[in-house]
């Protein structure tokens, strides 16, 4: 369930102020609205605990996209477990995203993730879409050469 925030809070026995920790977690959840997983998602994830995922498709997409982008001259952080790629923007990340749109490339500015100067590109799509996108990435790279 990529993107879902599922987890739990463990409070060691050594914590003397157990109730304050619970209160702080509850306040954070009410204020921020996304700290603790909603009950519905907790129930849904319990049905998925024994499920497996074939990560070979993600790996093939990762390799294809990473290899092509680095060949075109982009500097990328090679993912080791994510379904997205961080690419160093050739200019301000928001301007770079706007330039990518001219070639129908959808990227997210890294500043949205407190990582300015980079863009995030998801590769959890059909392999054919990655293949079809490569000429556009090549044209984008040529704009900065």
Where do the model's predicted regions map?
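PLP-dependent class I/II
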Residues: 1-145
């Amino acid at each position: 369930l990529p993107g879902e925030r599922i987890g739990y809070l463990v409070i060691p026995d050594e914590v003397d102020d157990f109730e304050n920790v619970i209160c702080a977690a509850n306040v954070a959840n009410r204020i921020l609205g996304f700290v603790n997983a909603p009950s519905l998602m907790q129930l849904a994830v319990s049905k998925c605990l024994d499920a497996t995922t074939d990560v070979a498709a993600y790996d093939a997409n990762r390799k294809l996209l990473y290899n092509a982008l680095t060949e075109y001259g982009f500097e990328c952080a090679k993912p080791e477990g994510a379904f997205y790629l961080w690419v160093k923007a050739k200019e301000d990340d928001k301007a770079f995203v706007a330039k990518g749109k001219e070639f129908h490339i959808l990227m997210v500015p890294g500043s949205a993730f407190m990582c300015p100067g980079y863009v995030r590109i998801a590769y959890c799509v059909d392999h054919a879409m990655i293949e079809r996108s490569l000429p556009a990435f090549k044209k984008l790279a040529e704009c900065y050469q």
